[in-house]
């Protein structure tokens, strides 16, 4: 059934007020925005927060609709934030870039492993540099089938690389002139948070004011799991719930706080674009996060576990900068 038919049915009735709810999923938020613009209250329920009896294993559209209606009537629906068209478009661009990153990694593996099977190894320094690319272009094989396979793999690598660079340029242009620009500039005061990372966090989280410094870690799945009963308390690894894209960006940025704190040209350039208040807060965050890394290393803490803790605190600093009142 199309959205227009649904709207005609709702507006054609005699009920003064309608409440509409549906589960978040692959259908996106177009229906919710359409209904809200028409004056109909609509909520998009978070599937992970829907309460369902443990013995209820029959899942049909009719039963799901009744279950959602019952929870809506009781006020037990946990709604997700509905992004604007511009916010959703920015998020799609960020995720397209992430997909391209995965495609590029796959293409590089195919090229390197094809050469390795032939006993060809590059010893000229770091891989995937300009010098390495020139070396890859010189590889030739006597067997026609092998040469065609290598050419196809190398062409796929170049295509993925070109697509990634094109998306990087488009994201940087959008980050410099959009509704996300103020947040991107403030987040850029942190080590490891480049323009691409800052824009990705801004697009994925959207409205930072709905979170707090205490809740953003749980929202991104960076807090520990807990199994408690009475006086017994057992904690495990991080929950890894919530937005996996933003969590990956923070985890990668957290590693940058481990080396000695020496601001480089790129970081200083991002500082110059931000306000003095954001710069001061970013410098305080950088110093504290590096100090925590030093303590973790002194205790010989597992680096992966330590990085998760740094990412959790980094999320709090990002929230602090994003909601900073300048």
Model-derived segments and spans:
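A detector of single, family-specific signature residues
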Residues: 1-326
């Amino acid at each position: 059934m199309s959205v227009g038919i649904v709207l005609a049915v709702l507006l054609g009735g005699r009920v003064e007020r309608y409440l509409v709810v549906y589960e978040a999923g692959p259908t996106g938020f177009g229906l919710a925005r359409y209904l809200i613009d028409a004056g109909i209250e609509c909520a998009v329920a978070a599937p992970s927060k829907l309460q369902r009896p443990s013995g209820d294993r029959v899942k049909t559209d009719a039963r799901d609709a009744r279950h959602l209606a019952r929870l809506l009537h009781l006020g037990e629906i946990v709604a997700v934030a509905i992004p604007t068209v511009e916010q959703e478009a920015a998020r799609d661009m960020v995720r397209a870039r992430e997909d391209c990153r995965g495609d590029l990694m796959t293409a590089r593996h195919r090229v390197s492993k094809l050469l390795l099977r032939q006993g060809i190894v590059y010893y000229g320094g770091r891989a995937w540099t300009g010098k390495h690319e020139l070396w890859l272009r010189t590889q030739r094989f006597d067997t026609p089938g092998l040469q065609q396979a290598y050419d196809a793999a190398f062409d796929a690598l170049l295509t993925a690389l070109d697509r990634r660079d094109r998306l990087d340029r488009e994201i940087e242009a959008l980050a410099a002139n959009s509704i996300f620009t103020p947040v991107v500039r403030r987040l850029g005061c942190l080590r490891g948070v480049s323009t691409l990372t800052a824009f990705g966090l801004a697009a994925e989280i959207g409205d930072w004011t709905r979170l707090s410094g205490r809740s953003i870690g749980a929202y991104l799945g960076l807090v520990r799991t807990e199994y408690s009963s009475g006086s017994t308390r057992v904690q495990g690894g991080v929950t890894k719930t919530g937005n996996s894209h933003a969590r990956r960006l923070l985890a990668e940025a957290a590693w940058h706080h481990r080396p000695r704190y020496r601001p480089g040209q790129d970081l200083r350039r991002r500082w110059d674009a931000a306000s003095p208040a954001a710069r001061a807060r970013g410098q305080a965050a950088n110093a504290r996060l590096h100090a925590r890394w030093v303590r973790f290393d002194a205790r010989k803490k597992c680096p992966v576990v330590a990085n998760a803790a740094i990412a959790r605190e980094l999320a709090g600093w990002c929230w602090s900068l994003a909601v900073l009142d300048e």
